[in-house]
Amino acid sequence: MSNLKRFDDEERESKYGRVFAVSGPVVTAEAMSGSAMYELVRVGYYELVGEIIRLEGDMATIQVYEETSGVTVGDPVLRTGKPLSVELGPGIMGSIFDGIQRPLKDINELTESIYIPKGVNVPSLSRVASWEFNPLNVKVGSHITGGDLYGLVHENTLVKHKMIVNPRAKGTVRYIAPSGNYKVDDVVLETEFDGEITKHTMLQVWPVRQPRPVTEKLPANHPLLTGQRVLDSLFPCVQGGTTAIPGAFGCGKTVISQALSKYSNSDVIIYVGCGERGNEMSEVLRDFPELSVEIDGVTESIMKRTALVANTSNMPVAAREASIYTGITLSEYFRDMGYNVSMMADSTSRWAEALREISGRLAEMPADSGYPAYLGARLASFYERAGRVKCLGNPEREGSVSIVGAVSPPGGDFSDPVTSATLGIVQVFWGLDKKLAQRKHFPSINWLISYSKYMRALDDFYDKNFPEFVPLRTKVKEILQEEEDLSEIVQLVGKASLAETDKITLEVAKLLKDDFLQQNSYSSYDRFCPFYKTVGMLRNIIDFYDMARHSVESTAQSENKITWNVIREAMGNIMYQLSSMKFKDPVKDGEAKIKADFEQLHEDLQQAFRNLED
């Protein structure tokens, strides 16, 4: 009995402080001299995870990322001496984490409970799974620096996990592991610098609040294709861009976020559910494994390229802030491998509300609507981590992080502080309209208030691949704007008294709205629209508009006037074909057949107008 150690952590004694006061998720601790800002601490006997957010004398204010019920004054507070960090390595893809990167699946298997117990301490990445490691052309004696690629792990059939030297490391290679199976904490590389030997495992730990370094930021030049016609044609985003989707409840923010995750041309998806309903995350978990993407003729589940950070509305409020940073750090890690990453944050409003709650508990001076004065700066520091970059190290590679942030303003009010601060930062604004959603027009994107500042950046891409597209888009915007101006006149005097050309504008605008902008994301033919189909549909609709106007204007002075009624009666079949272009299924029919069908319809159009004028 006497040889049993009474204290496991005698050497940790000096690292303990004491709880002084508790106020919800905010805990004040004393005897904390020597702590650093944003240091990770463990609070109470349950060892709850917390982060120091303020220091005064030897008092520290701690933001706790778990439920603090049961913490009493005098409980120990253990300092860890390191910032809140995430583990980066093989095993991230296909996983689901909470806001502080605890693996929810593993916790569920260990506890057999649907709840996360307090203070649970499970490693984020499995220490028992082994991965097949293949060294790249790095030999013993070669010099490497931070960001260099030294190995390859086939994480799954969609993602090749490239092993990156820690950005802060450098030196001469003393040992590189031969090809074989290794666990994430096995040493696969040893470097020597200034006589100091460093051992590297497949696992990297990185502080979440610190952006990962890059060689340089590059201008974006490639579109982020979403598969939603209204977004790809009128308000395109780029790979490495920032986008906000504000909208009231029930407008379809989550459906757009999920459609982006399913069908966008990204290599890796990080989906952060921040303070939203748990059902939405479970829907993602249920749907994604069933959905597949075809790469090189092989169909794969898209869950293999997705990682989820779930921080639902019933989880502690403070962890929402951490979940956003966890998500962006995971995104930057995959960007450094040379991938195009998309991060969905659903929703940044809940994150801002968490900031507001913590700020209120700290008795800080409130600004607009009770949000803290630094709300704009916090949002900017998050969105500025997006971008297309030249990655650190060799071989040379480019990667990008695109951020799509959903914003839920109360009552759909776009003058809300979070929405207005976000719109000052992001470059693309997809505004959702309650009236469109009530009319069951989905995606309910208001084409009059939305905008994209990336149009000019993408002109080269369009000129090279789809030269006719830019004038078509300009024409569509003109027609929709004209229709909006005419709609007031129509309500006053009716359609009959309009000029013939205005009647054509109204009808084509109706065709555009119902059969081009509207899209059923729950149908097999329309849940995803490739860009060639979008351009083909636009071309036929706009050519119909131009020819109809030309026919009416050229015969206006002659005896055989062509009016809109004449066109409509003569071209019933053509108009039906125009409105049913969206039913072409890109998976079943294939690109060549759809293009041929659209070309045939275009010829029929021209022939029909020739017959009409003769």
From Swiss-Prot:
The keyword Metal-binding does not apply. ATP binds at G247, A248, F249, G250, C251, G252, K253, T254. GO terms for molecular function: ATP binding; ATP hydrolysis activity; proton-transporting ATPase activity, rotational mechanism. Its EC number is 7.1.2.2. ATP hydrolysis occurs at the interface between the nucleotide-binding domains of subunits A and B. ATP hydrolysis triggers a conformational change in the subunits D and F, which induces a shift of subunit d. The c-ring is subsequently rotated and results in a continuous proton translocation across the membrane. It holds the Pfam family ATP-synt_ab_N. The modification Phosphoserine is found at S142. CDD domains: ATP-synt_V_A-type_alpha_C, ATP-synt_V_A-type_alpha_N, V_A-ATPase_A. Catalytic subunit of the V1 complex of vacuolar(H+)-ATPase (V-ATPase), a multisubunit enzyme composed of a peripheral complex (V1) that hydrolyzes ATP and a membrane integral complex (V0) that translocates protons. V-ATPase is responsible for acidifying and maintaining the pH of intracellular compartments and in some cell types, is targeted to the plasma membrane, where it is responsible for acidifying the extracellular environment. V-ATPase is a heteromultimeric enzyme made up of two complexes: the ATP-hydrolytic V1 complex and the proton translocation V0 complex. The V1 complex consists of three catalytic AB heterodimers that form a heterohexamer, three peripheral stalks each consisting of EG heterodimers, one central rotor including subunits D and F, and the regulatory subunits C and H. The proton translocation complex V0 consists of the proton transport subunit a, a ring of proteolipid subunits c9c'', rotary subunit d, subunits e and f, and the accessory subunits VhaAC45 and ATP6AP2. NCBIfam families: PRK04192.1 (NF003220), V-ATPase_V1_A (TIGR01042). Belongs to the ATPase alpha/beta chains family. This is V-type proton ATPase catalytic subunit A isoform 2.
